[in-house]
Structure formats: structure tokens, C-alpha cells
């Protein structure tokens, strides 16, 4: 039988919501003392996932690929369809988050939901999540560095970007994001609030200027236009690859789950943060996608440019206004990386707390001054920088290494959802749950993750060369092989899954804050 953990609730006082959650009691029931401060309100929890998904950063980074893999038809209708499927994933994850609101999130819930081999399920989920998040931090920093260089090149035409400069700028960005995460979680919460408004106001500015300023817009029927410039003769295959644009954007919403131990009323606010961030991102992203699609003037010129969304801005708004829009995009990317690093450090903190990482005692320690896992922050920074370094010599090498980002995260998302489905009626939900819709939505989520994971690992351009080869399956295989060898060599004897520090009354006495 699987372990069943009820969600402790305080008695509701007169006039209050009957679901009043005692956050500390919930954490103690799961075997953990309180070491982090609860400064995240509902909006803050939503903000971190909304910032990591970051529709401005995601769409501007991948729009060009979509123009050649399906064109407007897949960019728009693919966005709608994939958004719905991702919302199913988020809803299924949210149900699990309500039952197990801990920083460990995916790996913790996998260990608790597994009937057998709890340690193994938890181990592989944790490492997929860790590697995916590290790759996300590195890739987002690299994208921001690339757009910063594009802005500088527009401002000073004599400037010629180099790979060395890109790596150095990326390193500076990640280190600065590490410094911001070193201070109190209250600062992180404030920055995430600013990020939400930066994204929303930035969206309004970009979309409104694209509506008002260009002399030419495409006709309404342009949304059905199809392009397949992937090099593959099959239009169906090319269109399927175009679905990746939306999937690449919708990652990182587990951030709300990872911030559970720092969120007030986490059993309700964390799942709401997950689902709301996906829902609002889907709507705002569709608006931005339509604005960009209808502002394309010369399709061939834009699709063939090095940065198609930037070319759309230049063609439609003029160079001066385009540079202002580019600053909005750069800001969005910087906020995205900051939030991603925050989520990453909480996963490291929790994974180390359960003894899964080398030097675990070091990484799950909390600063007595800021009440944040400072050492975990700098481990995340160091690992992200290590992934960036190969870009000094080869952009292809960097792309190959970070290609595990999205597929690693989505596979980590699938594990606890699948285990919850396998548990059936034995699963005891928290106060936020899907009721009778839990199982059909969960199966749709697992099936879509399986299908999209295959897409992530298929060839994405033809002819297949060293530069165009999709290294995601190789990167994933390396992660799984290393994790498997490590598991059978030593880990299975020392790591049995999530650790309980004692009875609720015992762990309550260990609270540090």
C-alpha cells in the first residue's frame, strides 16, 4: 500500500473560508521542519511561474523556427491546441501540489505516490528536474545575452558580436541573478511582482505599436497560411515540428510547486499559481502571436533573417521604436532567468535535504540572516555556468548540452502525474483537486507529454548536419545513463526517497523560523 498523508487543516473561524490551511502543520505532517520563511502570497506564487513561462521571452526566442515549421497556421492554431494540453498537465500537477506542498515538488511527490521502488522513482525524477532547470537557466541567460548583443549591434553598427562575448555576457547575467537570489525571499517576491507588470505592460506596448504603426498588415486569411521550410518533404511532419514553439515556451510552471514552503496557504495557492500562470500565459501569448503574425511584411525576408521577430519590429516600427521594444524583450528574459534560478535553488535545497546530492549537508543549509538556501543558489549558478562554457568554442556544443532542458522537465512532470493515476482511489487529494475529472485529465496530460517528448527528440531540420542535428536524445541518454549507474553503484543504498525527520510534534520542535 502506498503511504497516505492527509492535509492538516485548522478549524475555520466565523465568516472565514472553511478551507483554512495550517501551513506548518502540513509541512510537519510530511516530516519536515520549517526552515524557510513564508513571504509568498498567492500573487507571488503565481508570479514566479508566469515569469518563468514568460511569453515574451519564449515567443521571441522561437518564433523564427515556427515561421519555417508550419508558418502562421501552426504558430496560431498550434499555440491554441498545445496551450490546452499544457493546461491539462498543469491541472494534473496542481492536484499533486495541493496534496504535497513541498520544495521537493516533483521528486518528493513521486517518492510518496510510488507503491514500490520509491527511492528509484524519486531519484530519477529529481535528477531530470535538476538537469532540466539548470539547462533552462543557462539557455535563458544565453538568449538574453544574444538579444543584448542584437540591441548593441542596432545601436552601434560597427559592433560585431562574437561567441566569446556572448558567453561572458551570459556569465555576468547568471552571476547577477545569483546575487539577487542570495538576499531575502521578500526581495525575490518583489522582483517577481515587478516582472508580471513588466510582461503585461510590455505586451500591451508591443502589441499596440504593432497594431497602430505599421503601414501594412496581412489579411485575416493569412492566419491559415502554411509554410514548410524545414527541409523535410512531409508537410505533416513539418507542421508537427512547429508545435514545439509552444511547448518550448510553456516550461517552468513547476516553479509554483517548488515555492510551496515559502507560500502562505500553499495547499491552495500553489496549485492556483500553476494553473493561473498557464491560463494567463496562453491568452496573452496568443495575443502577442497574432500581433507578430499579422505584422509580417515580407515573409521570405523575415523568415530568412537571424532574428525574425526583431526584423518584424524593424520593418513595421522603424529602427528607433524597434530598439525600445527590444529593451522590453531583454528585460523579460532577465526576469525569466531570475525566476528560473529561484525555482532551481529550491529544488536543490529539497533534494539535498533528503540526501540525494553529493555534499547534501552543505547545499540544504539556510542562511541565518536571510533565511534563504544561499549555498544552493551558488551551486545552481556554478552548474549553469558550466553548461555555458562550451559555447566559448562552439555554439553547437552549447545547444547540444542545454537541449535536455525541455524534455527533461516534461518527463519529470509526467512521473508524479502517472504515479498518481496508478494509485487510483488510494490517492488522497488536498483541498485543491479535480474531482472526477482528475483521472481523464491526468491521462491526457501523460499521453501528451509522451507524444511531445518524442517530438522534442526527432530531427528538426534537413539535411541533418553537425549544426542542425537534434542532440536532445543524446543529452537525455547521458543524463539517464549517469543517473542509472550512480543509482546502482551507491545511491540506492543511501537514498530511499523523501526522508521524514520524525513525528509532527518532533519536527515542529526543529523549526528554525
Language model features: what each stretch is:
Residues 31, 76, 155-165, 194-323:
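Helix-loop-helix junctions that connect adjacent transmembrane segments
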Residues 65-76, 143, 152-164, 185-196, ...:
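Transmembrane helix-loop boundary segments of multi-pass membrane transporters
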